[in-house]
């Protein structure tokens, strides 16, 4: 199966809000049942455990609806670990969804506080949802222990991915966590079947299989990390058809 370069519907601006909201809900469902959460948490658990960390900071680039930062926050709270998370999202409508979702899914005892700063920040009980671009994140070098990109890199060309990894390597003190899809015919036909069974949302039905077509094989993912030349990396296969990569930036 050759890689597709066709853009997903989500990559275009001005999608109808109702269609986008439903698609984001569907993505949360797919993350829950098809390994999106499991992949990220496996990587984070490995890194936090290896460092015996009692606290950490994390930047989630292209956070979408913020469900993964919310899951990380709850995971950390249950282990007595203090997590400080910035969820970066360029789209204003999606950033608002993330702000609301993270407030609902984390500690309900916190009083909601909405702050709009220069970058359009939305702060919610340990998670700051910030409007910003992953190409030029508005943060200083070495601002975070970890930089996370979940199901984001497959949206870009190989050259762009290498450039993004180099940009993020300057922000991460400890590691970059990449969780994404693996291109495979079984994954493609499988997600087509699964999405047709539970939704009629045109964005989900279009983008879910296209995401698999736009993804890379395991060998191609490894080659991208080598090309970036930002430091040693470990790559793991996560069921079903996901890649988890932990990259340690050179200093």
Language-model segments: residues:
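Class I SAM-dependent methyltransferase Rossmann-like catalytic core
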Residues: 17-42, 47
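Class I SAM-dependent methyltransferase SAM/SAH-binding core
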Residues: 59, 65-105, 126-136
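A conserved beta-strand element that flanks and buttresses the S-adenosyl-L-methionine
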Residues: 148
């Amino acid at each position: 199966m050759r890689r597709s370069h066709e853009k997903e519907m989500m990559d275009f601006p001005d999608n109808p809000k109702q269609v986008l909201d439903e698609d984001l809900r569907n993505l949360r469902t797919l993350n829950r049942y098809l390994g999106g959460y499991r992949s990220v948490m496996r990587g984070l658990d490995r890194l936090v455990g290896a460092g015996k960390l009692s606290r950490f900071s994390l930047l989630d680039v292209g956070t979408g609806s913020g469900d993964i930062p919310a899951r990380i926050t709850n995971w950390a709270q249950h282990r007595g670990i203090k997590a400080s998370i910035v969820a970066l999202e360029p789209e204003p409508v999606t950033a608002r969804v993330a702000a609301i979702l993270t407030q609902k899914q984390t500690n309900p005892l916190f009083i909601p506080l909405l702050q709009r700063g220069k970058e359009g920040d939305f702060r919610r009980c340990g998670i700051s949802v910030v409007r910003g671009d992953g190409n030029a994140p508005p943060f200083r070098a070495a601002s975070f222990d970890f930089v996370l990109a979940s199901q984001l890199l497959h949206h870009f060309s190989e050259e762009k991915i290498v450039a993004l990894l180099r940009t993020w390597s300057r922000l991460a003190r400890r590691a970059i966590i990449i969780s994404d899809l693996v291109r495979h015919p079984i994954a493609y036909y499988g997600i087509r079947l699964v999405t047709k069974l539970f939704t009629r949302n045109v964005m989900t039905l279009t983008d879910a299989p296209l995401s698999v077509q736009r993804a890379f094989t395991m060998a191609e993912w490894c080659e991208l990390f080598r090309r970036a030349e930002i430091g040693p990396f470990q790559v793991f296969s996560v069921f079903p058809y996901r890649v988890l990569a932990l990259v340690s930036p050179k200093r």
